[in-house]
Amino acid sequence: MRILFMGTPDIAAECLKALYAAGHDICAVYTRRDKPVGRKQVLTAPPVKEVALAHGTPVFQPRTLRDGSEDENIRALAPELIVVVAYGCILPKSVLELPKYGCINLHV
């Protein structure tokens, strides 16, 4: 199944790994932007981004999805399903209606 994954923290990264292990086609990953961490404020990628890049999956990090700026990009990815795990952004109705089989959202 062609899946668009959206998530950010460690728990989401573990879910993404499970989807890869199950043989699903992850067409792209959406995650929050890299942010400064620690005393030296080192710019650090979210765990989901690291997993996706290790698998050669395209990663997108928009500030928001609510303004519709990503609708065309998501439509072009043609996901059959969107899986959301602790993403941190609200998905607008325009995105929720795109995939053939809808969206699955896991709150943690």
Residue ranges and their predicted role:
Residues M1-V108:
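One-carbon transfer enzymes
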